[in-house]
Amino acid sequence: MSKTIFIIGGAGYVGEMLTHQFSLRDDVDTIIALDKEPQSDFSQSLDKVIYIQANMADETWQAEVAKHNPDTVIHTAWQIRAMYGQADKQWDWNVGGSDKVFAFAFSTPSVQKLIYFSTASSYSARKDNRFSHLFTEEEGFRDDDYIYAKEKKVSEEHLYAKYQEAKQKGQSVPQVTVVRPAAITGPRGRYMRIRFGLQSALQGNLKGGIVNRIVTLLTSFVPATKGWVRQFIHEDDVNDIVMKFTFEAMPWDYNVFNIVPVSEPVFAPDMATAVGKKVLPIQPWMARFAFWFFWHTTRGRIPTCPSSWRFYSYPLLMSGEKLAK
């Protein structure tokens, strides 16, 4: 039976990638892509796509989507880049919008599966984190002042509470799968989308504009603390995981997975070698000051919002063992 897939965040990096991959499958009839941004030329070229331009926090999309009877909901949308001076608006978009997505998934009879993209950030980057400790799904998230980590933690809590409430009422609920990805990378992320990210900056791929020129200058070396480390997952692996969770019968009602390879992480010397640069050793206080300075002087155009400096300064590594099994 052909599936109808509803992707929230259909104009984003992951959402558009999944839209493309689903459109190539014979067992998919329709992909409904929702995003607050306009549909890209690439997305317009894809078959089977119904595009709805709306913010997930709005009340304008639910009836339109419901009439297509989606059986799988994949929530990839997020305003990741912090909005300077607009924290309440951002919270409404992200947390409030996610609540509406969850409410739709639990109240629409056709929905059989809900896949939610969460984050590694909500494990919290702290001074006492160690390279040797890999956070597992069972440890759960920790409180953090970094707005992205805080919002994602609250949204996961809301999702689980919504699930528990529905189960207690004896309602039929979709199978829920939460994925917490490492940093997603690959050729699509590097070249098909304009992304203001760590790899783009270090590789010198940011083009045009005074802000991008400043960032490129600042990353002529790889500035790194002793605790700097990253985990990456290839976009093809993300796609394969989502396809597996979408099309195969899974033996759970609600489950959470770190999606990260069971392999060595990328340390600062590794990153420097990969981008052909040298490491510039710095202290955490230097990162904190730089992040504060550029956040306020550029009014958020350089994405260094409060508390995000800790994720550049201290290790945060996940275990991928649960998924590997």
Each model region followed by its residue ranges:
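NAD(P)H-binding glycine-rich loop region in Rossmannoid oxidoreductase-like domains
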Residues: A54-G96, A125
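Conserved Rossmann-fold NAD(P)-dependent oxidoreductase catalytic core, especially the SDR/UDP-sugar
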Residues: D99-K150
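Catalytic helix-loop patch of NAD(P)-dependent Rossmann-fold dehydrogenases
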Residues: D128-V179, A183, S200
